[in-house]
Amino acid sequence: METAQLLIDISKLTEGERIEMRKLGILTNDNELRDYKFPSIHAERPPIEKFAVHAPQVLNEAYNYQKPSSFSRALRLELGGYKILIVSGTASVNEEGKPEYIGDFKAQLWRTFRNLTNLLTAESMSWHDVVRTTCYLRDIERDYVEFNKIRTTFYNWLQLDPLPASTGIQVRLCWESLLVEIELYAIAKIN
């Protein structure tokens, strides 16, 4: 890997960063970038295959945004005849990576459900395959009642039974303009 590919300037690392990066094997004792070597344990046991999932009609990968982030929007794992979809926290963001419906919690929640639905559809899955959600609200005291009304309305419309397991948490989301974000896990048999 060339230094130019890094997002950090090695010459400006703190001593603590250098120590930890050496212990991780990223830097040599001379503070030079070490070439990455694939772990030998994977010669005997290959890592599980992971596939990035895309729904570009409604949102793009986070690393393609104007302010990029280093994570996949969603991953599909295949295990013993089942596929598992793991979706990162998803919010009311459009295909250009810009927040939609600033200040309108209810519209943001519906857009979030649309983005999640499109990610599920991209993998031939539906909300009936969802087993768990984690729901992040910027202001849980102000917005939870409306959140639960909309979520219940959506789930009832979908005729979900049983409902996915879920946890609700109040957090500061990545952008001040975002009021709600949801991550989910879905499991389905591979046809």
Which residues does each PLM region occupy?
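N-terminal presequence-like segments and the immediate start of the first folded domain
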Residues: 1-114, 118-123, 128-131, 138-191
